[in-house]
């Protein structure tokens, strides 16, 4: 009886379970979900949850699917396929594409200069949540997951992509303009704001025409 009830709620209906897992992973975004989290939501064993995940992975491998289900450091998440990168690049560089917001520029600048870096570290520097800017930058293929940090939860590490270099007319990261000195002994809120303004200015200089960033000095 208990087994029947569990099947009604979870993996007893494979198609429904796959759809639920896909929805969960979409909602989780770039943080993804662990096997235990997925199993808990489906109210099934981890073995049953893994079977559903594997079926969904197989579905995503079909040519007509634009996303893939990947496992990174024990966490499952949805990601675009590498073969679609040229089209994502076109989206970024399209004349009608909306410019990056100030929040996205700040986040991108921090990643560019501090990579590899976690979301928590980005938010510590910015002082605000950075989920939406990260999602925007991931969607535009300007940043990517480059690994997992050590420690509790093994958070995702972010880094820039080749598309980032193309977007700002750079050949390598070494061509990034030098930053103003950043003191570690604490600064006023105004000085922190100026720091971010400088970062955004450095990056946005190349934004309209995707030209080379200006170097200081």
UniProtKB/Swiss-Prot annotation:
InterPro entries named among the record's database cross-references: ScpB_csome_segregation (IPR005234), WH-like_DNA-bd_sf (IPR036388), WH_DNA-bd_sf (IPR036390)
For whether the record's keyword set contains Cell cycle, the answer is yes
Biological process (GO) annotations? cell division; chromosome separation; DNA replication
Which UniProt keywords are present, listed alphabetically?
Cell cycle, Cell division, Chromosome partition, Cytoplasm
Q: Name one GO cellular component term.
A: cytoplasm
Indicate where this protein is primarily found: cytoplasm
A Pfam family found in this protein is: SMC_ScpB
Q: Give yes or no: UniProt keyword Cytoplasm.
A: yes
Kindly list the places in or outside the cell where this protein is found, as annotated in its UniProt entry.
Cytoplasm
Query: What family does this chain come from, according to its entry?
Result: Belongs to the ScpB family.
According to the record's subunit comment, the protein's assembly and interactions are: Homodimer. Homodimerization may be required to stabilize the binding of ScpA to the Smc head domains. Component of a cohesin-like complex composed of ScpA, ScpB and the Smc homodimer, in which ScpA and ScpB bind to the head domain of Smc. The presence of the three proteins is required for the association of the complex with DNA.
Provide the function of this protein. Participates in chromosomal partition during cell division. May act via the formation of a condensin-like complex containing Smc and ScpA that pull DNA away from mid-cell into both cell halves.
Under what name is this protein listed?
Answer: Segregation and condensation protein B
Organism, by scientific name, is Geobacillus kaustophilus (strain HTA426)
